[in-house]
């Protein structure tokens, strides 16, 4: 059985024979139970698709959804999100936090390994986090760390040294993180790909070749990448050295790049995909199909004004444009895909909203 998904509330046609831990998309961040868990036998290969090129496999260079989708399955962080979008232990088995909420001490699981058999240690997090906060990072997301980690911003600007930054390996299994201000959602941040570890010796050895091909990388997530072509897609297989490998139920994943939505739907209907997202125009055709499912995506769409423009610098003109858009009609009639009229930047369904 397959499934059709429409995506905003996302309607989708999606194969329904997946069990246990499997492949996750970029929004879930949880390859161990955050996706669809449906009845049926274990499948050998999941055939998935993304709608644009997978630009890079280099973690500190990735800024697109497609690259995040792959990295989220080939790597893992201290914590991961469960099916209810709550952080659960991943590479870390536990943590403590100081009374003032500023010092987190993470204890890594015993026996963690990279896909080449090299031990994974707290130093791998230190190296990776420093790389993400440095000028080497080209993905535009270093603020996700530098806004929180003590002296992270200064390190990136070259005014602080590595040993002054609030991330330290106390021993192979103990990572100490000092943040600037109490941050109740800090565990959520550690589920993001910017917080994933990297092996310093391997990255240094590969140099500029790191991430160019699947053979120039090692992995710590539920899957390893066996082939990669930015314009074609990737192939992935179960990572047998992954700490939770016993719960990875889908041995192989193929990720195709199909930019045209109608082509993706036709490929799905021909049996070439296990999941396809539907446009709002296709929803009426398939909404009564047993393969049709609707899921919620936490995202907002908004207008951003160029304040250097003389007209847009006028507050009243910006307000007038805001009042001129009927969000309810836009969501219910034009999009017609289950979207909700937004009242702010934080999406409905996000914790606290």
For the regions a language model picked out, list residue spans one by one.
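Ligand-site clamp/hinge motif
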Residues: 214, 240-284
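Surface-exposed binding/hinge segments that line
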Residues: 141-201
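Structural transition elements
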Residues: 341-353
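Short, low-complexity disordered leader/linker segments with a strong preference
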Residues: 1-46, 86, 205
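Aromatic- and charge-enriched surface segment that lines or borders ligand/interaction sites
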Residues: 93-141, 176, 311
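N-terminal lobe/hinge region of extracytoplasmic solute-binding protein
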Residues: 49-99, 218
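Gly/Pro-rich hinge or "lid" segments in bacterial periplasmic/extracellular proteins
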Residues: 179-248, 252
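A bilobed periplasmic-binding-protein/Venus flytrap-type ligand-binding module shared by bacterial periplasmic
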Residues: 237-241, 297-320, 324, 333
């Amino acid at each position: 059985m397959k499934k059709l998904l429409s995506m905003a509330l996302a309607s989708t046609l999606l194969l329904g024979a997946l069990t246990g831990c499997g492949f996750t998309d970029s929004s879930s961040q949880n390859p161990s139970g955050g996706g669809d868990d449906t009845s049926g036998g274990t499948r050998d290969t999941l055939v998935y698709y993304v709608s644009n090129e997978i630009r890079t496999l280099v973690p500190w260079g990735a800024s697109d959804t497609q690259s995040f989708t792959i990295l989220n399955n080939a790597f893992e962080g201290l914590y991961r999100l469960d099916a209810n979008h709550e952080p659960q232990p991943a590479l870390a088995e536990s943590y403590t936090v100081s009374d003032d909420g500023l010092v987190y001490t993470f204890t890594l699981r015993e026996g963690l390994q990279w896909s080449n058999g090299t031990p994974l240690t707290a130093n791998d997090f230190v190296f990776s986090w420093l790389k993400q906060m440095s000028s080497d990072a080209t993905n535009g997301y270093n603020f996700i760390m530098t806004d929180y980690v003590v002296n992270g911003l200064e390190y990136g600007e070259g005014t602080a040294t590595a040993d002054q930054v609030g991330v330290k390996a106390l021993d192979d299994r103990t990572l100490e993180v000092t943040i600037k201000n109490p941050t109740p959602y800090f565990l959520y941040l550690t589920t993001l790909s910017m917080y994933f570890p990297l092996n310093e010796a391997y990255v240094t050895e590969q140099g500029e070749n790191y991430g160019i091909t699947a053979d120039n990388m090692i992995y710590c997530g539920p899957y390893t990448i066996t082939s990669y072509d930015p314009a074609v897609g990737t192939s992935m297989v179960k990572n047998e050295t992954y700490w939770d490998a016993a719960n990875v139920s889908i041995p192989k994943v193929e990720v195709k790049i199909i930019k045209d939505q109608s082509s993706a739907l036709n490929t799905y209907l021909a049996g070439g995909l296990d999941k396809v997202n539907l446009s709002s125009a296709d929803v009426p055709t398939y909404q009564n199909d047993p393969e049709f499912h609707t899921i919620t995506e936490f995202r907002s769409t908004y207008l951003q004004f160029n304040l250097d423009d003389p007209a847009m610098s006028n507050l009243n003109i910006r307000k007038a444009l805001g009042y001129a858009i009927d969000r309810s009609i836009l969501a219910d009639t034009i999009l017609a895909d289950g979207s909700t009229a937004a009242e702010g930047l934080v999406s409905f369904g996000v914790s606290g909203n």
